[in-house]
Amino acid sequence: MDGAVEGPALNSAIIPNLVAVIKDASAAVDAYVDVARGKCREALTKADGRPDRAALERQQHMAHGLSWLGTYAETLLQTAEWAARLEQEGKFSTTEALLTQILFSEYCAQLIGGVPMNQGEVIRPHELGIVAEADALFATPVVQQLIIDGKTPAVMAAAAECLPDALSRNTVEETGLDETMSMVREQFSKYASDKIKPHAHEWHLNNEYIPMEVVNEMAELGVFGLTIPEEFGGFGMGKIAMCVVSEELSRGYIGTGSLGTRSEIAAELILIGGTDDQKTHWLPQIASGEILPTAVFTEPNTGSDLGSLRTRAVKSDDGSHYSVTGNKTWITHPVRADLMTLLARTDPATNNFSGLSMLLAEKPRGTDDAPFPADGMTGGEIEVLGYRGMKEYEIGFDDFKVKSENLLGGVEGQGFKHLMATFESARIQTAARAIGVAQNAFETGLQYALDRNQFGKQIFDFPRVSNKLVMMAAELVGVRQLTYFSARQKDGGKRCDLEAGMAKLLAARIAWAAADNALQIHGGNGFALEYPISRILQDARI
C-alpha cells in the first residue's frame, strides 16, 4: 500500500503465516458460535422449531448476546477473506497485518471472556451455556497464539508507528475495493474536506440547515441518483458505491452523509413497488435532486412497532384522493422536502401490518418561518442533541390530501411489505454512515494527539493514548469488511438482512467508542463546544 510503514522492527511484531492463522481462528470461532446458536435455539424456540416470542422477550439478554457472537464471527470471517485477497495481490502490508492481528486478538479474547454489547452490558459464555466450549476455544493453538501474542505492548507500539502516515490517506488500510471505488472515494473525500468539514461545526452549533448550495452541489455530484438505474436518470451503481459515498460524506458531517438516505429509501420503494408510470415520473426527479424526499413512518405511540400505525388514509367517494389524518414523529428533513413516502392505514378494519399502504405524498417546500404551508399539515421542531443539519419534526395531518394515483403500486395493503424490502439497504447505509463518523473521530483524535505536547513530548507517544487510536483503526478494518460484504450480497441479489443488521449493530458501537475515546484524548478540551470532537460525540450517539 502506498505510504504504508514497513521495516524489520514492525514486521517482527507480526505472527508468522498470519493469514493462515486467522483463517483457522475464524473457523474455530464459527464452530464455537454454532454451538452457542444451538444452545439458544433450545431455549428460545418451541417444540416445533418456531420462535417462542415469550421466551425471546424473557431472554432478551441471551438473544441479543447471540447476535453479538454471530456478528463477531462474521466480522472475523470477512476480515480473514479480505486479508487473503490482499495477500494474493501483494497488498497485505505491515499496516494491514498488524491491525488485523490486533482485531483478531481482541475479538477472540472477548468471545471467550465476554463481549461488550454496550458500556454496561456484557454477554459471557456461562450465560449462553458454552463455558466448556469457551475453554476449548482458548485451548485452540491458533486462537491462543492470537490472544497471547497478537496484542502485546510491542505489537501495539508497532501498530501505532503506522498511524501518523494515515492522515495523508482516506483510510488507514487498503480496503480491497476496485479502482473505480477508489476514485469515487477520492472524489467525495476531497469534497467533504473542502466543502463540508470547514463548516460542519458552525452548522451544528447554530442548528442550521445544510445550505441548499451544498445540497445542489451534492446533486450535481450524483449523490441522490447513485443507485438509481441509468434508464431513470441515475448512475446505476451498486450498494458498495453507496457505502463509499456515505462514509466520506459522513466523515465530513453526519448530516451530509444522511441527506442521500431519504432519496435512497424513496427510490428503492418506487423501484420495488411502484407502477411503471410512478417510476418514470418520480425516479428521474429524485436522481437529479430536483425533488427531495422524506420518510414519514414513525408515530408517537408506536415507535418501532410499525404494524400498529394509526394514521388513517381514507379514500374519497369519487376515488380521486386520500384524506390523511394522524400524527407522525421523528421525521427528518420534512420542511425542505417535496415528497413524503407516507405510511398510513387504508383499511380501518385491520390493526396490524396488513392494512397499511405507502403513499407518495407531494408537498410544497417550507421555510423556518412557514415550515408546512400545505393545507392539512402542521408540525413542530424536535430539538436534538446531534445529527443536525436537516432538522427533526413532529407532524400532524388533518384531512391532508394525497392523489389516489400516488398510492405506491396502485394496490392497497402493500405498504409494510414494501417498506420491509428497503431495510437491508437502509441498514447497510446506516453502517456506512457510522463508519464515516468513526473515521472522523479517529482522524480528529489522532491529529490532536500529534499536535498536543505534554511533559516534553507528543501525547501520542504515551501508550494509553496511542493504544486507543490503534484499536479504533483495527475495528474500522473489521467493520468495513463486514459492511462491504453486506453490500456485495445486496448487489448480487442475495438476501442480506442478517448481515446488514450485523454491520449496523457493530458500526454503531464502534462509532460511539471511537468518538468517546477521541474525546478522552482531548482531555478537558473535549468538553469544550468549540472543539469539533464535541459534535462528533453527539453525532455518534445516533
List the model feature ranges, each with a label.
Residues 1-252, 256, 261, 273-274, ...:
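Alpha-helical interface subdomain recognition
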